[in-house]
Amino acid sequence: MPDFKIVISDPQTKESKIKKVKVKVSDQIQSIQGEKEGKALPIAKINQKLKEELGLDTLLTLQTIKQEGDKKVKVKTHFKIEIDNNVPSDEVWIAASIAEKYGANEFEAEAYRTKSFQLSIDQSKLSNIIGAKIGDVIELNVSGIPLKVKITGGSDNSGFPMRYDVPGGAKRKLLLSGPPGFYPEEDGMRRKKTVRGNMITQDIVQINTIIIR
């Protein structure tokens, strides 16, 4: 079975506080199976003070600019946080396997609360999601973090979007006046477009969700 790409957004993360931090490799942190393939969230150790300062829940994003040849590339990683007050309040400790992505064992980065992230999860591990519909609330375990999320949309393996107002899971060609599936350039425009129904089937590859608390 192919993987589902699950996009998880946190509606409580609106105006994130951003802080410049020093990121260091720590041999206390082991790499997590699947983190390089986007199947699991890597771990970052931080001080309780930094967690409170940034208003974090369970996730942290680190972002920096990396020079690649004559180009500057944005590098961003989402982490599951672990509190360790041996970590200075202006530092974040990560595993060496993740530091490879940044090209250094020590570097400066912007740290902030994660707004959204994507994980690839084997369909066989989410068998309960087949048949669920847009608007349904499901439970996920993301790298040991239990989450309750609401399905808000998705798309199939051809890129056709799911629509909340189309029952079932089959593809249909409909006359649309707005998204998802059609973004009119002028008021009143309508077009026939192919879309998916509101039910998740094995043909769906991306599922969009928001965290429910």
UniProtKB/Swiss-Prot annotation:
Signal sequence extent: none
Assigned GO CC terms: ribonucleoprotein complex; ribosome
GO annotation (BP), single: translation
Protein keywords: Ribonucleoprotein, Ribosomal protein
Highest taxon, organism lineage: Archaea
Record keyword Ribosomal protein present: yes
Record bears the keyword Ribonucleoprotein: yes
GO molecular function: structural constituent of ribosome
Family, per entry: Belongs to the eukaryotic ribosomal protein eS6 family.
Protein name: Small ribosomal subunit protein eS6
